[in-house]
């Protein structure tokens, strides 16, 4: 019996609609045709009067249209993403109208290998035509056309669902306002294809009368499930523990806990999934390759109009963070709006199903700010602009940086913290803002504010940004923490017309006095750290920075030596009496 839950969509009814009639078959990428095609889907929430609150969910390999809620009063297990979809949840059904459909080729209501072939009156089985991700998305579009949907607020999907999201954004740029791609890849690499091939071979080697039996599918599922887990999660969950005994049995039974776990996953899977569908779906994944289809990844994204959120997980070794960063780099190169976060997680590829708090915050903030522009209230001061920077940053610092930036400019803030400077600039100067930040928590805050933020260490470079991408780049209180400031600064001068830099002055008289009289590493209000916990690794003065600019061929256009919260620059002996400084620089 389903208990009433305030955060559940409750009991939902799956619906099936015909999107392709017998007399008008759909032409597939392979050149084959298919008809008829039925699609099963579920909806949650309420469509608003403007019809602009629709979120479409794309499920992964073994998923279905049943993403949230319960199928009946007696249903004990909610939908596969119930943890994310519902009233007050990340995908809030009090705000959004959510649609999830079973994709083409699956076995949960939509036409696939287990469906009846109208020409034979029997299941298609291996007579079903080969399909691709593009075919699946085309059928999803036919469904939404049938439902009268004019535009999607967002398309969201994890793993194989993320591949569908990419196809959506590329093929229907005017239809998709935003795209959320989670734990996905622009193409399967040879390792992933190899795992799929072994799984298919296990199924095809276990055929009786032309039909696969349960054993092959169970083995394929076990192989696949290994790729969904991380080494850390397997070690933590299983280690080398035995199932029930303390000693080895010295036979071929399942003794280790991890063996029994995989046995359970395999056996439970065959009770709800069709082996032929598994063959077709994994082959469709193998065929997915945006570079092959569009010439290059950059070219694939050339015509997209969506706002993108790309999410990866640190321990995912199936579709690694490098795969996600490759997509981010291509979007950046095409100057498309994109946010990226690499979530710290021990759960491997399955983390998109197991990290509701962090992933939920990302989705909630991104969706909310895509749906409606957030209201910005200017704070009086800033405290902790970086996770490692406990120094109090007074608003005067931001106001002076703002004064150096023209209205309607394109600005990149490197080490942007919680994004407050960019938000101020958006509010006051109507800038086009982008940020880069290494701290995960601050990335979450920035996305929640509606900014386009990339989760990355700036020292890895900006090579994917074209020359002159920005009018201004801002490096605020970060220069002294960089391992290679020369490389970073040179890159900033390449991608931006002007670079604004602020940093603490380590030649400030209190620093000198502390070192001279106390014989200890100096500490001031601007530099509150002890020697062992400071993020600062370079101890530069105003003179040092100006020498540095001359060496690399940078022109100093404006110098603002500052002390405390005074807006007026220090004029007398600034290298001694300035606590910090702001510089506006450019290429000579």
Predicted segment positions?
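S-adenosyl-L-methionine-dependent methyltransferase catalytic module, highlighting the catalytic core
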Residues: 487-491, 498-588
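Alpha/beta-hydrolase-fold enzymes
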Residues: 175-176, 181-268
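Conserved alpha-helix/loop element of class I SAM-dependent methyltransferases that forms part
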Residues: 392-408
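A short SAM/SAH-binding and catalytic strip from SAM-dependent methyltransferases
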Residues: 472-483
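Short beta-strand/loop motif that positions the catalytic acidic residue
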Residues: 310-312
């Amino acid at each position: 019996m389903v208990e009433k839950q305030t955060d559940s969509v409750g009991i939902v009814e799956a619906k099936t609609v015909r999107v392709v009639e017998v007399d008008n078959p759909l032409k597939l990428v392979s050149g084959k045709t298919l008809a008829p095609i039925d699609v099963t889907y579920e909806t949650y929430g309420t469509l608003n009067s403007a019809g602009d609150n629709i979120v479409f969910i794309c499920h992964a390999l073994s998923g279905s249209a049943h993403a949230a809620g319960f199928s009946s009063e007696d249903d004990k297990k909610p939908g596969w993403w119930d943890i994310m979809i519902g009233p007050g949840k990340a995908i809030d059904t009090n705000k959004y109208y959510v649609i999830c459909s079973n994709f083409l080729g699956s076995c949960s209501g939509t036409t696939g290998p287990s469906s009846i072939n109208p020409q034979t009156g029997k299941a298609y089985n291996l007579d079903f035509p080969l399909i691709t991700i593009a075919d699946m998305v085309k059928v999803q579009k036919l469904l939404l056309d049938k439902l009268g949907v004019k535009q999607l607020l967002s398309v969201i999907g994890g793993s194989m669902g993320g591949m569908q999201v990419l196809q959506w954004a590329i093929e229907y740029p005017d239809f998709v306002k935003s795209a959320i791609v989670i734990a996905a890849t622009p193409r399967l690499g040879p390792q992933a294809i190899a795992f799929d091939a072994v799984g298919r071979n296990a199924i095809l080697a276990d055929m009786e009368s032309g039909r696969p039996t349960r054993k092959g599918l169970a083995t394929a599922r076990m192989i696949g499930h290994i790729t969904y887990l991380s080494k850390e999660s397997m070690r933590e969950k299983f280690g080398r523990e035995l199932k029930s005994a303390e000693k080895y049995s010295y036979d071929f039974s399942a003794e280790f806990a991890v063996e029994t776990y995989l046995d359970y996953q395999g056996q439970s899977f065959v009770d709800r999934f069709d082996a032929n569908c598994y063959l077709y779906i994994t082959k469709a994944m193998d065929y997915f390759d945006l570079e092959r289809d569009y010439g290059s990844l950059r070219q694939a994204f050339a015509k997209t109009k969506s706002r993108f959120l790309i999410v990866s997980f640190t321990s995912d070794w199936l579709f690694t963070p490098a795969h996600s960063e490759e997509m981010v780099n291509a979007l950046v190169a095409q100057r498309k709006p994109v946010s990226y976060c690499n979530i710290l997680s021990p759960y491997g590829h399955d983390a998109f199903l197991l990290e509701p708090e962090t992933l939920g915050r990302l989705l909630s903030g991104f969706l909310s700010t895509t749906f409606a522009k957030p209201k910005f209230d200017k704070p009086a001061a800033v405290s902790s602009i970086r996770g490692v920077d406990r120094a109090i940053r007074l608003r005067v610092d931001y106001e002076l940086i703002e004064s150096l930036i023209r209205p309607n400019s394109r600005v990149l803030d490197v080490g942007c913290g919680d994004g407050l400077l960019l938000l101020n600039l958006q509010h006051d100067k109507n800038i086009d803002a982008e940020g880069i930040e290494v701290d995960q928590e601050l990335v979450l805050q920035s996305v929640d504010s509606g900014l386009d933020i990339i989760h990355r260490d700036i020292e890895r470079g900006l090579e994917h940004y074209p020359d002159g991408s920005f009018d201004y780049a801002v490096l605020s209180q970060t220069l002294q923490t960089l391992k290679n400031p020369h490389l970073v600064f040179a890159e900033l001068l390449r991608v931006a017309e002007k670079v604004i830099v602020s940093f603490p002055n380590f030649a400030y008289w209190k620093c000198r006095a502390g070192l001279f009289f106390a014989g200890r590493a100096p500490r001031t209000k601007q530099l509150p750290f002890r020697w062992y916990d400071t993020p600062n690794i370079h101890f530069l003065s105003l003179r040092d920075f100006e020498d540095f600019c001359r060496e690399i061929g940078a022109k100093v256009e404006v110098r603002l030596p500052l002390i405390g919260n005074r807006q007026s620059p220090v004029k007398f002996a600034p290298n001694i009496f300035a606590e910090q400084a702001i510089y506006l620089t450019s290429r000579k």
